[in-house]
Amino acid sequence: FGRRIGAKEEEAFFIGDGAGKPTGIFNATGGAETGVTAANTTITFDDVMDLYYSLRAPYRNKAVWLLNDSTVKAIRKLKDGNGNYIWQPSVREGEPDRILNRPYRTSIYVPELAAGKRVMAFGDYSYYWIAERQGRSFKRLNELYATTGQVGFLASERVDGKLILSEAVKTLDVKAAGK
């Protein structure tokens, strides 16, 4: 139950539209502010650097990158003018890689690289507030599956979430096709 509830919460907190669910960080209305708009679906290192500096310095101290695995892959493939990869893996054992010396987290619910999408966020997520409106409840459903000899369970929870200070998190948006 915990994994499924956690996955649904993660999805809502990242891409929820605020209608009967939390307002997600990547929602264009009520979510994070746009920091940078990439010209196309090929992200450049300049785009990443511009996103970093679009976030005000006080928020950078606790900032974390949030992106999809496909975006991490695109960033890892970036090369300098001499053909060397810009991404440098961690040199300390047990310490994860970083982007511009800040940690990153991936989620399947962060939109993938595509035109018109917000594909990456950078910021201090302590300004995303989560409220539990009611505790988790579990119900055993004996009768529903009695004819097949099975027992069902129903879990429910009511939560809400919203970025209360939109300037604390910035996104990298990809320009919509044809614009």
Regions found by a protein language model. Name each.
Residues 1-179:
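Structured, hydrophobic secondary-structure cores that serve as assembly/anchoring elements
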